[in-house]
């Protein structure tokens, strides 16, 4: 039951409107706790047990409160420790910087003392006075007071550690700390004053030195420039000193203001901290009150549980004693009901009294306000009366009419004078405008003549320049056309060469693919006949020369070839690798470019190739022949060796022929280089392009011949393989593979060289294109210059025409001005006529003024009649007001009677409701003679109230926090899941967090 009571108390605290919460809190604060009832006890042991249980319960409550207090105190201690740490840190920072300041001041004082000792010594007559070793001027000799040591109590504890400083501050009292800090401040002030005095003495010393220099300059022959320089430096020094003093004063003032603001900030922070502490104290008090309230609620819940348990026991018990208990509980319920009724009645009476009290206070306030207003009637009220407004309207009307007449008269006179003055001014302006226009016309004619002469000169100069440019363009035209034709032909030829190179590359890839297939076939055949050996297998295992040995070459070795041969799918990878190798690297391109500059390197390269091939063929040694070999095979092997030697000799001959060709090309390149150096720029470009073209053609022809040879050899090898037996085919295939590898390396090197040469040719062609572009740009610039000259000539013609037109227009303007002068004379005549007409109109205005005065008299008479009418209306208004005053008391009486009737009606309704409740209770007593039956009926009513109104089967165990209507949890959850999220009673919308369970015990 205690758990249910706690849940109910928590639910009551969490739900309900704030008004109900406040009333409940007020009730709990005034609740009287009844003594604890221990119930039926049969022995002292049970008494001790229950007392111990109660004590344990109380101790647990106190322990919880103690733990909460300890947690809060621990938090406060942590906050205070943090604050103390920050305060200690700030104190240490202040102490450190103050100590540094004192040390620097002492160092300055020691420096000045040393300078004073040096300056106190007698000076030699021939020595020059100047600054010391550290760059500061010597002070005066009379600085003995600076050398006096400061008192010990004024010196700060500079060597004192930080922790000792904090401990000393904590150990000493506030008076001691204040005295110590005061002494430290006095020391700092004294030290700073000493520094200032020393600086003043130094300044005086400098001035004396300057005076001595001036006097010595007067006695000794010095240049005027040096004297002027010293004077300027002295003035500059004084100006800088004044500026420094001003800046120091400004800095001191700003620092004082900053310190004041800092003090204000610290005071505000202390106030904030104090307010935070007060807030924490108040929160502590609130927590204490809340705990007390929870405790009282718990006691009240336990008391209610015990009361309910006693009620149910009494209802379930039988006999005479049980009947007495039920009757007492019935009386208790009746008293509670009467008490509630009386409370409701008292609340209604109190509301009525408060309403009447508010009405009474409002009436008293209005009465007092009206009395005060009646005693001091302001002028505004008098001005707001009808009579005053009528008189004011009549007066303002007459006054406005008189002002209008007066203003009209003044306007007529002013208009007459203005017309006369404007007429005279207009005549003067016309004369001055005529003179100004004549002068302007003369000056413009002179300017136009000058501009015309200048334009003619410019036109002649432009014409001469245009003819010169035209002649120059006619001479340069054929050359430019020839250059364009040459460039276009070279571009077409370069495109053709690129196409041929692509085609040869494609053929080379096909040949490489066929070589890969042959390798695969030969590797398969070697695996099929493993017992047969080849005398040159050891020579095949030697690595082929790569790029590291002698320039560009194939990267793959025979070992790699043997490893890759068994897998047929690896042929594509080898072909792709070879395709990548066909692209010349940057090192090869650089080598080719260097070969163009120094052909000896290219000459040495072909000589190195046959040596490498011979080394590959000779190898580490021939393997031992097989044991089961026949003499015919040995003869074949000898023939094969002879054939290999013959092939090597042919290869050497080819390499020597290539060497000769390379030497011849070297000589041609030297000749071309000499011609290129001696020829002009345009011819050099032409020669370079032609040489590149010739070189590319030769390389293409050589590549074609190489490809044909490779194809023929491939065909021959395929025929030999088809005709011979298996062993001969295998050996021939191996030899062919070796030979093809070597040829492939050579072709690759040649191909890479050709590709690099093609790149060089392309680069030269691009340079030529850039040069041609520059030439075309120059041609365009010349054309643009010619066009500009033509446009300037056209513009000059147009300007000439425009100037003529302007001259004609100015002549027309002169004629127009003459016509304007004539027109102005006509307007003068018209204005004179207008003046005469205005004089006539002035007479008409005077006549109109007399008519207006007559109308004014007529309006005055009308105003008198209106005043009489206002008097009549005033009498009627007074009559209406008296009648209104007579009707107002009747209205007040009727209002009071109506309020009294409504009050009596409310009272009668309350009496009727009270009597009806009593009648219902009496009927119950009459119907049910026994008190148990009455209680059972009431229990049924209460159960009906506790059942859910939606399903009428389950108990109410869920509340909607939006409207505080109670239903069963299943109905509320079903409506929420069915998206009917509205209260069944009041249609108030609710959400997922707007309903929860309640426990009604």
UniProtKB/Swiss-Prot annotation:
Pathway(s) the chain acts in: Protein modification; protein ubiquitination
Catalytic class of the enzyme: transferase
Region feature Disordered, mapped onto this chain: 1-31, 116-149, 516-646
Subcellular location: Nucleus
PROSITE patterns: ZF_RING_1, ZF_RING_2
Modified residues (N6-acetyllysine): 20, 355, 517
Catalytic activity from the UniProt record: S-ubiquitinyl-[E2 ubiquitin-conjugating enzyme]-L-cysteine + [acceptor protein]-L-lysine = [E2 ubiquitin-conjugating enzyme]-L-cysteine + N(6)-ubiquitinyl-[acceptor protein]-L-lysine
Principal location: nucleus
Cross-link annotation Glycyl lysine isopeptide (Lys-Gly) (interchain with G-Cter in SUMO2), location: 578-579
Gene Ontology CC entries for this record: HULC complex; nucleus; ubiquitin ligase complex
Self-association state and partner proteins as the record states: Component of the RNF20/40 complex (also known as BRE1 complex) probably composed of 2 copies of RNF20/BRE1A and 2 copies of RNF40/BRE1B. Interacts with UBE2E1/UBCH6. Interacts with RB1 and WAC.
Family listed: Belongs to the BRE1 family.
Protein name, entry field: E3 ubiquitin-protein ligase BRE1B
Organism of this sequence: Macaca fascicularis
